[in-house]
Amino acid sequence: FHKLPLIKGKTAREELQERGLWEDYRKQYPYHPMAKFYQDGTEPMTNDADLSYYGVVSIGTPPQSFKVIFDT
């Protein structure tokens, strides 16, 4: 069992807002909050671009480090 430090980074939304690209992103990938109530038998996934916590995981010898987003 390993413990990883939790690091707070910028969300994709924050990055896009800083660059002035958030509105274009939302137009290209619209958010439909009522979609989950449709009676078509599917469960749509949405990307709100607001994941901001991650950890650094190192694997191998020599170690290679990866940023891993903890989204659940």
Swiss-Prot record:
Pfam families the UniProt entry points to: A1_Propeptide, Asp
Keywords: Aspartyl protease, Hydrolase, Protease, Zymogen
TM helices/strands, residue ranges: none
Top-rank EC class of the record's enzyme: hydrolase
Molecular functions per Gene Ontology: aspartic-type endopeptidase activity
ATP-binding is among the record's keywords: no
GO terms, biological process: proteolysis
Name used for this protein in its record: Pepsin-2
Organism for this UniProt entry: Thunnus orientalis
